[in-house]
Amino acid sequence: MTQATIIPRPEHSISRDNIDDIALKVLYRLHKAGYRAMLVGGGVRDLLLGHAPKDFDIATDAHPEDVKKLFSNSRLIGRRFRLAHVFFGREIIEVATFRASQIDENKSNEDSDRAHDDSGRILRDNVYGQLEDDVWRRDFTVNALYYDISDFSIVDYTSAMDDVKNKVLRLIGDPQTRYREDPVRMLRAIRFAAKLDFTIHPDSEQPIFDLGHLLADIPPARLFDEVLKLFHSGRGVVSLQLLRRYNLLQYLFKPADDALKQGNETFEAFIHLALESTDKRINQEKPVTPAFLFAAMLWGRVDEISEELKQSGEPGTIAMQNASSMVLSQQVKTISIPKRFSMVVRDIWQLQHRFKFRHGRRAKSLLMHKKFRAAYDFMCIRSMAGEVTDDSCDWWTRIQTLPPQDQDILLKPAKARPRKKKGAQKN
């Protein structure tokens, strides 16, 4: 077993002043109850990088049932990994028990607390161990640093402090095996590389080119969560670039991947601008919706099918409705899209053709539509990408700046041309 390097408090930059008070409360209660209590994972990594952690996760030798007894405000969750969530109002601290690195090989998967499928993917992993075991179950070295509340030291088994310093993302263990255990680790590698501006170590990146197909076995609901983490991190543009570099986009958004591989420059400009806009909003701490992401990623295909249906004689509105259903029904086989978001995706798409109407009831109802703003933003990005060639973006931008009475004047129906009287003689 590799010996741990202990970095004492004077030799690292983590201060309790930067650790969430609630996380400290959980750490101290576990410690006072006689358990080992360690801050672990991204929280330690981010503190060392000078970032404000989004989450503070805790690892301990207390079993989930022990944590439940110690915290009346906790709940046990998960089947694949049994965890305790400790609730303080709306804040949740995740407490995980140290996991073992291996199990008694005389036990069958059916009789043990760990199970794999035929490709090596972990289905269940509730074999508990000690800190020195748990570290080898972590994914990347930079996520395997432990902050010990008992003496405020950092415990490092994997030379992770060097990787943090050198901004290198390195898998723990054999990369082929680790990716097969959980193919989502390939997406996590891309997410961390994009988010932290790290370089994936050559030994960890090479298998990604060969194992991307394993993502097809991941449940669509889990991929939905992972896609949001990738593209709602404030680094969506970089995430897309890395997904394309490692040829993984096809396993998430095949229509977008096909369009980009075919050299569709307009769509490439559009998707880049859409992600750039989302990144900007996230970094400005403005709200974003998954619906906008899915609408953008799938727009090229839905627009293409809609045009084909119109060419075959379907009215424009019906063509877009049918195209939307076709594309979404195919996409949810890969990534599930909750109905509350898929309905907004449909609205964004189906409102696009209505921006050409600038007068009368149709224009007024569009301006009043509850999803007008999302559809308008979408249309303006299409305009910036060169897909919308008229002045629709400028016109609809201007009308939103006007007071209601001036809007009504501008939206007033154009006067109908006078109808010729029956029997009127032509000159």
Kindly label every feature range from the protein language model:
Residues 1-427:
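Catalytic cores of the polymerase beta-like nucleotidyltransferase superfamily
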